[in-house]
Amino acid sequence: MQMEEDRFPTTVADYCSEFDIPLKDLKLKCVFCRFYLTEQQLAAFYIKNLKLVWKNRYCFACCTPCLRLTAKFEAENYFQCMCKGEVLEVLTRIPLSSLSVRCFDCLTLLSFAEKIDCIISGQNFYLVRGRWRSYCRNCIEK
């Protein structure tokens, strides 16, 4: 079954294209709570460039509250290390502009400017489950 599911679209954009459904008409359930995502949550999922999950030929996304809980759970259970931004490029051997960093709280993909802001403001970067995280412009103020 997994092999067959590997052929299904993994992004919202690919899903809409593959099944010829406008984003505004798309209805997907959350993989965790099974409630339908609101239009705003689906748009946020799309903008964050997160991957869809296929289970038994059904497609799921993740609602905003469950996404935040997932980020918290992963940070509490899969934290590996943290470092200051000044050493991140040396540590990873990847230019900051190419390094994928998601928000520690909401899993938004940080822009290059947000990564620079994290460094300037002295924020830490955290390695969680093999992926780097820090804070996006919306969560850093909370």
From Swiss-Prot:
Keyword match Metal-binding: yes
Localization terms from the record: Host cytoplasm; Host nucleus
InterPro entries named among the record's database cross-references: E6 (IPR001334), E6_sf (IPR038575)
Domain of life: Viruses
Renumbered zinc finger spans (unnamed): 30-66, 103-139
Subunit structure comment from the entry: Forms homodimers. Interacts with ubiquitin-protein ligase UBE3A/E6-AP; this interaction stimulates UBE3A ubiquitin activity. Interacts with host BAK1.
Job of this protein: Plays a major role in the induction and maintenance of cellular transformation. E6 associates with host UBE3A/E6-AP ubiquitin-protein ligase and modulates its activity. Protects host keratinocytes from apoptosis by mediating the degradation of host BAK1. May also inhibit host immune response.
HAMAP family the record matches: HPV_E6
Protein family (similarity comment): Belongs to the papillomaviridae E6 protein family.
Name of the molecule in the record: Protein E6
Organism of provenance: Human papillomavirus type 60
Gene that specifies this protein: E6
